Amino acid sequence: SQNATLRNILDAVYKMAVRKRKANESRPEGEKYAELQRVRLGSRLLAYLPLRITDELVGILRSFKDKASRVGVTQFIIQTHFQSPLEVTPEAKKAIEAILSAGWIITNQLVYTVAASGRGHKAKLRQTLNAMGVVCYYTFSVKGFHENYAVFAPNSRSLQEQQEEKVFGLIPKEKQKELYRLIRYERPLGKKLSGFLKENRLLFAATDRSVLNLPA
């Protein structure tokens, strides 16, 4: 989409948030509308076309965050889709830094295919993304039906990865609230997340949910 399209979409979202808040001023308790608290945009541009993340686009994101924060929106998320640490090019790093500078956070979803399920592959991806301030959101096992049978990794491999590889990034219980506050409130996140990992001697933060699907 063009920048103008994104600007129009975000303007519409902002106006909706304003309308709900205004309407709630005259509605009784128990009948108020649920107000907008989170905006999440899904895009794989960071992985396959990072040069699309221009100063103008980042400015649109920053401007929206500034005004939406004043009407109750507290979370601004770009959900992206890196499958391999090899996709994290210098251009991708620059794009990530630009978006983080606008006050948004970036989360990553991984589709757990055969190519992405090699020993140590996911651990390295977590480490690479965390080093730049990207939070791993979930690892998704596909169902293994006819349309994706040739590329799916079975649930057993995902379970093995959790027990033998993901375990090295588990956050100590006494540090979980600190990490939550960091991800939830600290902006820009990049160096702060790296500092947390270094301070706690962690290779990465295993924050991603491992989502299993049948009949895989």
What is the meaning of each model-derived region?
Residues 1-71:
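Conserved Radical SAM active-site core
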Residues 56-59, 93-95, 120-125:
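Charged helix-capping and loop-helix junction motifs
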Residues 7-14, 96, 123-126:
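Short, well-ordered alpha-helical packing segments
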Residues 46-48, 74-88, 95-96, 100-119, ...:
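Conserved strand-turn element in the central/C-terminal portion of the radical SAM core barrel
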Residues 123-216:
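Auxiliary Fe-S-binding modules of radical SAM enzymes
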Residues 1-2, 13, 99, 128-130:
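Conserved catalytic-core segments centered on acid/base and nucleophilic motifs
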Residues 59-73, 101-102, 128-141:
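Structural recognition of alpha->loop->beta junctions
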